[in-house]
Amino acid sequence: DYYQPARGINRNLCGTPSVIALSAFEEGLNTFDGVDMNDIRDKSMALGSLFLELVMDQCGEFGFDLASPKKAERRGSHISLTHDHGFKIMQALIDHGVIGDFRAPNIVRFGFTPLYTSFQNIWDAVEILANIMDKGLWKDPKYAMRSKVT
């Protein structure tokens, strides 16, 4: 009957947020003061629609298919695309500063946080994606290495 701490990083797991973490959380909530949730949702839909339009225009030839609903009103603040080489493509995007998500077997997912994602961010991300696809940068073997977190 004695305490035996977990090994490795698991020793630092805690189920109760610290006072410092809660104060940071409270400050984060202040971001929403005076913000209309309808405005946030409208921008979210506009960001996603712009992304989808640009991807279809600039990357349509590269084998992407839409996995999310096409209508903005029917989807959340993200767009999911399928591609046979989705994992490698997402790793190349991350390496080039575009942070998205991969879900097996072939889904690349892009989230749009309207409070701090700009329309310019969308243009830049799609330009990077088009460059990666056009030049075949995703084919570099380093992008095939899998880790626990994608």
PLM features per residue range, with description:
Residues 1-19:
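A short glycine-threonine-serine/GTX helix/turn-capping micro-motif
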Residues 8-14, 32-82:
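Conserved small-domain helix->loop->beta segment predominantly found in fold-type I
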Residues 19-27:
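Well-ordered alpha-helical segments within folded domains of soluble proteins
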Residues 28-31, 54, 132, 136:
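Short alpha-helical functional segments enriched in proximate histidine and acidic residues
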Residues 55-56, 86-93:
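Short amphipathic alpha-helix segments
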Residues 82-87, 116-119:
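Helix N-cap motif at beta-to-alpha junctions
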Residues 92-150:
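PLP-dependent enzyme catalytic core of the Aspartate aminotransferase-like
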